[in-house]
Amino acid sequence: MQDHQATNESFDIIVIGGGHAGCEAAITTAKLGFSTALFTINLDRIAWQPCNPAVGGPAKSQLVHEVDALGGIIGKLADETAIQKRILNASRGPAVWALRAQTDKREYSKRMIEILQNTDNLSLKEAMITELDIAKSEQVGLNSKKVVKKRIKGVKTFFGSYYSAKSVIITAGTFLEGKIWIGNKSMSAGRSGEQAAQGLTQNLHEIGIKTERLKTGTPARVDKKSIIFDELDTQPSTAAGKYFSFDPDIKNNMPQVSCHITRTTSKTHQLIRDNLHLTPIYGGFIDSKGPRYCPSIEDKIVKFADKKSHQIFLEPEGINTPEIYVQGFSTGLPENIQLELLRTLPGLSKCKMLRPAYAVEYEYIPATQLQTSLETKEIEYLFSAGQINGTTGYEEAAAQGLVAGVNATRKLNKKDPIIFTRESSYIGTMINDLITKDLKEPYRVLTSRSEYRLTLRGDNADRRLTPLGYQIGLIDEKRWSAYEEKMKLLEEEKLRLNNTRLKNTDEISKKIELDTGSKIKGSTTLKELLKRPNFHYLDLIKYNLAKKNLGYSIQEGVEIDIKYEGYLKRQKNNIEQINRQSCKSLPQEINYEKIDTLSLEARENLNKIKPKNFGDASKIPGVSKADLTALLVWLKIREINKEKTNIFCQKKLSS
């Protein structure tokens, strides 16, 4: 980029992309007092939900709770625009409980635009960014070698406008060189109806950032009026009173609707088998990897050939639209065959397809090129967040957007970044996975990915992260006061339950014994009662032993804390033990190739990722416990040798 380029405007921070990551990043930086510009190709499609019109689900809901606990937006908007809510995994333990909301996608986007337009320090710009302006400077590094430092200076648009910035956050989603496929036909697009971002990928390569290619897909939409609902199972809203947000002022005034369930048939499966060669993947037109945990219907038929039927959900896209999202039925088959397939499903034999399913392949930045702060290793003050980092899902994107936004502001303020660890949050689990693992398929957060899932529940996200959100400056005084009041009530109730004792001769004790079939020997506290597997806080209410007017979230928190007290203490001890070892730092100048005591795979992977500490090193594929022990010994020898050298130099200087 030429130095004489005239500057249109200057900002502290520029965000490239108006999806869920971009919106969280821009709102975060603007709220923290930094002049911010959000650039997007289409201002009418801000925070769009191009795939399923839903927020939450297993592990994803935990992410949404965490973003909200820190002061983010996605949870509030999901609550306000929800047209159906359900608790998933309700019959299992609290570690895997998950809230899922069906949202009105147009209302969600509309409200996000309103928030952006009314946020101080934030400007919205419709433009395609094609080039990043990088400043280079030579500095003296280790061993007196000259090192070229690169720093972001600004951005250039397709039509030649230049905007300077102290920091840039890329949140381009699936738009970098995006291409959508239906059968063997393709066109350049970031998603259906929207042009792909051209030029920026090549520019990233020129400045030293590698990109690779991934694939995802979305199902067809059908006309609600053409569905025979009598042939379907109904799935009503069952958790309208549950919220992602911990903000007590959040309300939902949307009508609640039902989703419906159908299933694939033998005709569906045969039609897919007969036409596999016409799909982009099985036909060999593309070879990009798609999401493992959201496979196309053809993948399901091929990989699970023994299954006679697959469940399909029909989900409304909003209150004022006839469009129904056919969840679990994404495909890359030609349009005419898609309609044939849909009509093999019960309830859809006369359906009209409003939008065809399609596959989309796009460029992404392998996140091993990022630091834990989401700043790129190659270029200072350049951050990357969202689907461009190889993730899939609005929730994963929103969480990364908030992290990148926070750390971009801290970098400009010369403060250390906020590092989210695996032990503290699902956000930390996700980021650690992204930057330490060589992922070859879109990444989805899962409860099974966390070693600490009982500690990292959705219900306690505020207890884990709201103090940090307040410290950062994203939680206002009103919200902080509500949090402090909740903590006070929670601790008071746990103390009351511990101190309130029932004798087995009390009338209420006899009633409890009769109802539960469990004896009270001598006496017991309410806390001990609550520890029983089949006794819950609702039972305390039933027997008039509960504190009156205590909110549901406090009742739930108290019960989980008490019922799982032993497990939680054990997990806390494990975390503290790991932290003592994992915090030991690893100098960035180490050349692991020269450490002979490490395995070859460990040397290669450690050199590639350059972990900051033992905790990060322990999570790198191919690095065994034996490698970590060898590395620890090597560091001790290195420190001893350094001390000897220093003593020798001091003696030489004094002689």
From Swiss-Prot:
Its main location: cytoplasm. InterPro entries: FAD/NAD-bd_sf, GIDA_C_N, MnmG, MnmG-rel, MnmG-rel_CS, MnmG_C, MnmG_C_subdom, MnmG_C_subdom_sf. FAD binds at G17, G18, G19, H20, A21, G22. NAD(+) binds at residues 290-304. Keywords: Cytoplasm, FAD, Flavoprotein, NAD, tRNA processing. GO terms for biological process: tRNA methylation; tRNA wobble uridine modification. Its cofactor is FAD. Homodimer. Heterotetramer of two MnmE and two MnmG subunits. NAD-binding protein involved in the addition of a carboxymethylaminomethyl (cmnm) group at the wobble position (U34) of certain tRNAs, forming tRNA-cmnm(5)s(2)U34. This is tRNA uridine 5-carboxymethylaminomethyl modification enzyme MnmG. It comes from Prochlorococcus marinus (strain MIT 9215). The gene is mnmG.
